[in-house]
Amino acid sequence: MLDREGFRPNVGIILLNARNEVFWGKRLREHSWQFPQGGIKYGETPMQAMYRELHEETGLHPEHVKIIGRTRDWLRYEVPDKFIKREVRGHYRGQKQIWFLLRMVGRDCDICLRATDHPEFDAWRWNEYWVPLDAVIEFKRDVYQLALTELSRFLRRPAQRAEKPRGPRLSRYPRVIGVQAQQTLTIVDTSVVCSEIEVEASTLDEMPPHVIVGK
């Protein structure tokens, strides 16, 4: 379903935790990261599409999140021809999106990347709200910046925690536990949660250092 200008109606989701960090998903078998997003089906409202895409891509249900805000109007990005199927070139130009800002009220363990038979992501992590967008595919970076900027007015200060005595500084570099070929690997990093995929030890060097694999 395209509009007259060749843009497909779509929703984008910025999911916050209590620390105002945002959910990033690593695209299946790729090295790029992105926010959940997806097309609006015929007869759906943007909100209905948002809840459907949220569940399909993260496994979360409406009771796991709270809507904080949304963009006032559509934000658009064009897709380069090399990423467009040949049969729709000349008609399809890109996506126009309504972006929703959600706060997660559930737990990290409620997130499931295999909620459907066709997962979009094979890993996920929490990132700072204003993290550089270098890991995002280039043609989406401008619309991400627009959405983050417009929705930043809804941010609140994270809850203050009682200061604890400082212990030894933990390394942010991952460590590997029980690495054996043909077995599930678990890479531990305090800023990342696990994906749900099995890999061989030989593929470890190809993975970005902040991904956890295994369950």
From Swiss-Prot:
InterPro entries named in the record: Nudix_hydrolase (IPR020476), NUDIX_hydrolase-like_dom_sf (IPR015797), NUDIX_hydrolase_CS (IPR020084), NUDIX_hydrolase_dom (IPR000086), RppH (IPR022927)
Keyword Hydrolase: yes
Domain of life: Bacteria
Motif Nudix box, residue range(s) on this chain: 38-59
EC assignment: 3.6.1.-
Keyword hit for Lipid biosynthesis: no
GO molecular function: pyrophosphatase activity
Cofactors required: a divalent metal cation
Domain Nudix hydrolase: start-end pairs: 6-149
Pfam families (UniProt xref): NUDIX
Transmembrane segments: none
Record's keyword terms, sorted: Hydrolase
Family per similarity comment: Belongs to the Nudix hydrolase family. RppH subfamily.
Function: Accelerates the degradation of transcripts by removing pyrophosphate from the 5'-end of triphosphorylated RNA, leading to a more labile monophosphorylated state that can stimulate subsequent ribonuclease cleavage.
Name this polypeptide is given: RNA pyrophosphohydrolase
Organism encoding this protein: Burkholderia lata (strain ATCC 17760 / DSM 23089 / LMG 22485 / NCIMB 9086 / R18194 / 383)
